[in-house]
Amino acid sequence: MATPIDVVIMAAGKGTRMKSALPKVLHQLGGRALLAHVIDCAARLSARQAVVIAGHGAADVEAACAHLTRAAGDARQDLSLKFARQEPQLGTGHAVQQALPLLADDGVTLVLSGDVPLTQPATLRALLEQCDGQRLALLTLNMADPTGYGRIVRAGTQATAQASSQVRAIVEHKDATEAQRGIHEIYSGIMAVPTRLLRGWIHRLDNKNVQSEYYLTDIVKFAVADGVAVVAHQITDAAQVAGVNSPVQLAELERVYQLRQATALMEQGVRLADPARFDVRGTLQCGQDVEIDVNCVFAGQVSLGEGVRIGANCVIANATIAAGAVIHPFTHIDGEKLGVQVGEGALIGPFARLRPGAQLGAEVHIGNFVEVKNSTLAKGAKANHLAYLGDATVGERVNYGAGSITANYDGANKHRTVIEADVHIGSNCVLVAPVTIGQGGTVGGGSTITKDTPPGALSVARGKQVSLPNWKRPVKVSKG
């Protein structure tokens, strides 16, 4: 039977260098909180539970965890999420001590950092294999500039780090000697340790160090003293253990994350004009032969069908775009809670806006400066320029003229407009809801329609044209 995994996530830090009132672990990377990435990673390990240790902004952190965006199909729904508070913050060892009452001795405790979002589940599985329920396993990395990191001190010499030699200690940078500071192998902040051993070692910690803190890393010397093997799983991918302590570091890690998203999509066959000018802030699923131009942002849950083409500078959130659709440049699609559906072969934009609840059928055309909100457009309907469709049901092959709008709001409530199949709406019309335009009807340009119109009828509602011959324009009066 596999040893149960209990994950402890360090999320108590203030993040002073972020210069923000928002707790550091709630700052976003790829459209999701740093902490959300870590929790999802824990879930993909099939962990029994995750204990989030909160401190600074604890109430905000705990509340946010209930609303963190889930990746499609992830296992987080099966992860038991619990909380412990570290008040005051007296070091990493003190932090883990707050979680101990929630941990059972039959498991392995995996310690992660809430501000280290790019660690991969495969890396942690390898670390857990090294632990094997009986060893203290550390995730380490060789760094050209290890300043600020705890150094891995191995048997034999303190100035070198041979991967084959026994780990003897972790020395924090501020407590390290000059010789120890010459070591380039660093501790990532991630470890796996049998909980029954961790419990005893935590209670032996003291704060006799430069920072007067209880270091979790001191358990290494206790393990050595007790004859417990201390092993290191060394990786080469620095981004997997990179933490966020400032807006600069957050921006740097964002670009790493986005490039990895872009690379994964291109390996699936997606054609990106420039992977350096592409952002995914949620999840993006693409069919075969999808093309995406530069400076596009995808947020929430977005699905692109086969052969979809996305023009430059588009923002698309929470939308499903069917095969063969073309989204021209500068289009904004935001499905929010209701979602947006774009049918096969539809043409959208440029400069179009699709708002929540827009449901567009096959071969629908939505042109420049057209806004659609909470409306259904059937196959072949067209609104090619300068128009608004809100709370409307539009039939097949409708042509909706430039400058026309549905007046859907009476100051208190929204009302629906129904435009039946094969209707032609002239330019600059106002359809005052609730109203129905009968099948095959025509509304003359400039009309304000307030009553239902019968099928096949021409409906015109506008003031009579008056022309005054020999009209003299007013002359501007000279002042002084």
Curated annotation (Swiss-Prot):
Active site feature: H385 (proton acceptor)
CDD domains, per the entry: GT2_GlmU_N_bac (cd02540), LbH_GlmU_C (cd03353)
Cofactor note (record): Binds 1 Mg(2+) ion per subunit.
Known catalytic reactions: alpha-D-glucosamine 1-phosphate + acetyl-CoA = N-acetyl-alpha-D-glucosamine 1-phosphate + CoA + H(+); N-acetyl-alpha-D-glucosamine 1-phosphate + UTP + H(+) = UDP-N-acetyl-alpha-D-glucosamine + diphosphate
Region (N-acetyltransferase): 269-480
Binding site for acetyl-CoA: A402, N408, Y409, S427, G445, R462
Ligand binding (UDP-N-acetyl-alpha-D-glucosamine): K24, Q86, G91, T92, S113, G114, D115, G150, E172, N245, R355, K373, Y388, N399
Region annotation Linker: where it falls in the sequence: 248-268
Annotated segments matching region Pyrophosphorylase: 1-247
E.C. code: 2.7.7.23, 2.3.1.157
GO cellular component, one term: cytoplasm
Cofactor(s) needed by this chain: Mg(2+)
Pfam entry (one): NTP_transf_3
Pathway: Nucleotide-sugar biosynthesis; UDP-N-acetyl-alpha-D-glucosamine biosynthesis; N-acetyl-alpha-D-glucosamine 1-phosphate from alpha-D-glucosamine 6-phosphate (route II): step 2/2; Nucleotide-sugar biosynthesis; UDP-N-acetyl-alpha-D-glucosamine biosynthesis; UDP-N-acetyl-alpha-D-glucosamine from N-acetyl-alpha-D-glucosamine 1-phosphate: step 1/1; Bacterial outer membrane biogenesis; LPS lipid A biosynthesis
Predominant location: cytoplasm
Gene Ontology BP term (one): lipid A biosynthetic process
Keywords noted in UniProt: Acyltransferase, Cell shape, Cell wall biogenesis/degradation, Cytoplasm, Magnesium, Metal-binding, Multifunctional enzyme, Nucleotidyltransferase, Peptidoglycan synthesis, Repeat, Transferase
GO molecular function: glucosamine-1-phosphate N-acetyltransferase activity; magnesium ion binding; UDP-N-acetylglucosamine diphosphorylase activity
Keyword Cell wall biogenesis/degradation listed: yes
List of residues binding Mg(2+): D115, N245
PANTHER family: BIFUNCTIONAL PROTEIN GLMU (PTHR43584:SF3), NUCLEOTIDYL TRANSFERASE (PTHR43584)
Family under the similarity heading: In the N-terminal section; belongs to the N-acetylglucosamine-1-phosphate uridyltransferase family.
HAMAP family xref list: GlmU
NCBIfam families, per the entry: glmU
Protein's recorded name: Bifunctional protein GlmU
Organism: Polaromonas sp. (strain JS666 / ATCC BAA-500)
Lineage per the UniProt record: Bacteria, Pseudomonadati, Pseudomonadota, Betaproteobacteria, Burkholderiales
This protein's encoding gene: glmU
